[in-house]
């Protein structure tokens, strides 16, 4: 059997009076109960005769339902039982089906419990609809008053002709002096019909966890990895804004025009640059250097660049054709060399623009400066706006903020994982870094969708603003 992983807290109050309380829950998980306890500070409740024992105590019993459920013509009776088995903790009336406004939901549940605990059962449907509880309170087992007086487990006519058989077992007895809590280890399968009841003076509180097999959790994580990774924003808590008016924000940050319009008079001066551009390839120098974050985070920019490349090929093909051009003819040239000076080899310019990559380790975080920003450095207490892409060591992206409103947080105040507070400190506006954050400075042994436990995380970050 695969190990079980806790996913949520389970709690259940079982009041005294031998009232059957179902353990069933709408939560799709196995229930693992680890503690039973009573509150010794509460006043004890008297029994039916008004007696209170010298040593108040409560006995917890578990009642297991066996047998099979089938359809029944008595819809109202079936509604009562479904309300009981489906978890009667809700204070709202069940939706659908007939109901008697003179009865509260509690009265309905008590009627269903009496049917479960009834000692006799009639054979025909009419007799079952007209039958009333005989008032005898069993302790989990009883005798059915059949013609042959055959002994059987305590039964409930929840589904017409078939019976719901109940078997009870004592779990523990608690008192208010010494034994007011008891560690237990009870696992209830998903969909299993189990009840609890208490005989005594105090309510018993059961606590534990909802658990699922670890294999199921891993399968769920794999499915989530295959989905759109941009839906998650776990390390930082910010959300991507995909509005159209913000989609070109990164282009505005570059401050460099993508297209320049020139006339045929200027073509002779620009011709050497066009030849140099064709030799260098399709990428702009700004995208060539060190593969910064801008080259990775904007799919829209990449698509636009391809269109520009196609236009460039068309223009170059037209130039090669023997055609006379007038001064009024205009051509579109991409501003791939706008940053180059009027003189000097273009190759030297490109080499000078390549930033030097500086790698250092600060408090366990590996910091690789891909691009140095301008202005003052960010310090603790500053509110910073960031773009980022988060990846695992295998290259799988689990989170990102590529466009829209930048992710904003206060540096050094614990609003993000520790590795971010360390790695972002010292950046200037426009700066880009690659942060390699070990597990103990990220999420440790916790597992998140897309992030296995004990994972080293890699973030490519860019600082957009300091407030």
UniProtKB/Swiss-Prot annotation:
Q: What is its EC number?
A: 5.2.1.8
Q: Which GO terms describe its molecular function?
A: peptidyl-prolyl cis-trans isomerase activity
Alphabetically list the UniProt keywords.
Chaperone, Isomerase, Nucleus, Rotamase
Q: Where's it found, cell-wise?
A: Nucleus
Q: Which reaction does it catalyse?
A: [protein]-peptidylproline (omega=180) = [protein]-peptidylproline (omega=0)
Report biased composition (Acidic residues) as residue ranges.
71-80, 147-163, 213-254
Does the record's keyword annotation contain RNA-binding? no
> Which residues are in the PPIase FKBP-type domain?
381-467
UniProt subunit comment: Binds to histones H3 and H4.
This protein's name: FK506-binding protein 4
Q: Which organism is it from?
A: Neurospora crassa (strain ATCC 24698 / 74-OR23-1A / CBS 708.71 / DSM 1257 / FGSC 987)
């Amino acid at each position: 059997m695969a190990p079980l992983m806790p996913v949520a807290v389970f709690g259940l109050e079982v009041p005294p009076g031998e009232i059957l309380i179902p353990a069933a829950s709408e939560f799709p998980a196995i229930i693992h109960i680890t503690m039973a306890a009573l509150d010794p500070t509460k006043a004890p409740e008297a029994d039916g005769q008004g007696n209170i024992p010298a040593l108040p105590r409560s006995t917890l019993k578990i009642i297991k339902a066996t047998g099979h459920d089938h359809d029944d013509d008595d819809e109202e009776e079936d509604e009562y039982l479904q309300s009981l088995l489906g978890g009667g903790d809700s204070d709202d009336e069940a939706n659908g089906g007939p109901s008697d406004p003179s009865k509260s939901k509690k009265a309905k549940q008590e009627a269903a419990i009496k049917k479960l605990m009834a000692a006799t059962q009639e054979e025909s449907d009419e007799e079952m609809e007209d039958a009333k509880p005989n008032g005898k309170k069993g302790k989990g087992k009883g005798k059915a008053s059949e013609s042959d007086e055959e002994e059987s487990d305590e039964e409930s006519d929840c589904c017409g002709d078939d019976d719901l058989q109940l078997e009870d077992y004592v779990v523990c007895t608690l008192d208010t002096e010494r034994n007011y809590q008891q560690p237990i280890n009870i696992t209830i399968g998903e969909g299993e019909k189990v009840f609890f009841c208490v005989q005594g003076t105090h309510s018993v509180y059961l606590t534990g966890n909802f658990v699922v097999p670890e294999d199921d959790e891993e399968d769920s994580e794999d499915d989530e990895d295959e989905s759109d990774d941009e839906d998650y924003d776990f390390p930082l808590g910010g959300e991507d804004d995909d509005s159209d008016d913000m989609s070109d924000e990164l282009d505005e940050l570059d401050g460099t025009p993508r297209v320049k319009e020139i006339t045929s008079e200027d073509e002779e001066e620009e011709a050497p640059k066009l030849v140099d551009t064709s030799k260098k390839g399709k990428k702009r120098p700004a995208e060539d250097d060190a593969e910064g974050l801008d080259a990775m985070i904007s799919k829209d920019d990449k698509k636009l660049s391809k269109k520009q490349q196609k236009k460039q090929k068309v223009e170059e093909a037209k130039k090669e054709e023997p055609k006379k051009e007038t001064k009024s003819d205009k051509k579109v040239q991409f501003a791939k060399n706008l940053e180059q000076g009027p003189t000097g080899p273009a190759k030297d310019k490109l080499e000078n623009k390549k930033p030097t990559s500086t790698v250092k380790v600060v408090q366990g975080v590996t910091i690789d400066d891909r691009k140095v920003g301008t202005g003052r450095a960010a310090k603790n207490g500053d509110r910073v706006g960031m773009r980022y892409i988060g990846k695992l060591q295998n290259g799988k992206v689990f989170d990102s903020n590529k466009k829209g409103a930048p992710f904003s947080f206060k540096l050094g105040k614990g609003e993000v994982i520790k590795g971010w507070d360390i790695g972002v400190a010292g950046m200037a506006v426009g700066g880009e870094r690659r942060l390699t954050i070990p597990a103990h400075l990220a999420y440790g042994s916790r597992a998140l969708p897309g992030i296995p436990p004990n994972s080293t995380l890699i973030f490519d970050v860019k600082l957009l603003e300091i407030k």
